């Protein structure tokens, strides 16, 4: 018997307040004097699908390094929020915040979470050209 497993991502819409709280926490970490982009920002660069929708491809295409990604993350706004996903692989914390940002007239899909209680780290699971249209509930 052949069975196909389909992984269903269930997006939820966080409240404006929750998105603002996430962005405030993100900015606090990024703008902290103690922030070290090599230790406090984890960028997942693995390529699962098409190479042109990978973080590595975008970084090469735009000649970006980690500090460029940090600068773009510092610019994120409520209007760029798209959705919230549940992280099936890591439930600590379970929420992944998804943003869409226009960079060089291309839409970039950004998926983030903040980990840790005392020493917080930013986990950037996606920073690549958007594969699909994105919705922006607070635009």
Question: Predicted regions: what is each one?
Answer:
Residues 74-121:
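Functional cores of ribonucleases/endoribonucleases
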Residues 114-139:
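Enriched for short, Lys/Arg-rich terminal
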Residues 5-17, 21-93:
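Compact soluble domain cores
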């Amino acid at each position: 018997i052949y069975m196909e497993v389909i992984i269903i991502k269930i997006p939820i819409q966080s409240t404006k307040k929750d998105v603002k709280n996430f962005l405030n926490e993100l900015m606090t970490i990024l703008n902290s004097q103690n922030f070290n982009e090599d230790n406090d920002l984890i960028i997942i660069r693995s390529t699962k699908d098409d190479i042109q929708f990978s973080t590595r491809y975008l970084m090469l295409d735009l000649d970006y390094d980690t500090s460029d990604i940090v600068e773009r993350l510092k610019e994120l706004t409520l209007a760029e929020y798209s959705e919230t996903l549940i992280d099936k692989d890591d439930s600590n914390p379970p929420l992944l915040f998804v943003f869409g940002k226009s960079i060089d007239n291309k839409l970039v899909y950004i998926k983030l979470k903040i980990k840790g209680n005392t020493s917080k780290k930013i986990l950037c699971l996606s920073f690549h050209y958007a594969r699909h249209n994105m919705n922006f509930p607070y635009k």
